[in-house]
Amino acid sequence: FKRIENRLVGGDDYHGTDGPLYLTTADCDNPLFDTLFAAAKEAGYPLTDDVNGYQQEGFGPFDRTTWRGRRWNAARAYLHPVMKRPNLTVQCGVMVNRIIFEGRRAVGVEIRRKGRTSIVPGDEIICCGGAINSPQLLQLSGIGDPERLEPLGIDMVQSLPMVGEN
């Protein structure tokens, strides 16, 4: 995480300052937070100055990815700066059904848009569907546990039984 962070209050052993994702610490200097932290302490919870630092358990100021009053997300940090690259295609309103392989090499994706299925070739395929959809997409593409995929008629590309188990 250190490499992605640009923590505006400075870096330390747990936070970076050179990454593209702006990170600010919430201003907790108000009666609501004072009351919340006092109640947490009274209930036996630890207090911490940095919930993403050494002592993660407990209550304390939280970091947020904001910059100049706007949420600063992964799209703003990574995608928007490279949108004009000739080797990048971003399509919205598209469902990716599976990754197309030739042997073990990804050569495209099968997509569905407005009820129509088509194949989009690509020299580089980036699987970035998050914690749920990335393993699902890999499994639908034949990467995963053969005991699960073969009964569904999915041709195996690579036996990796732990895909989807995290």
Give the label of every model feature segment:
Residues 1-106, 110-112:
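Conserved redox-cofactor binding core of oxidoreductases
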Residues 99, 108-166:
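Glycine-rich loop(s) and the adjacent beta-strand/alpha-helix scaffold that form part
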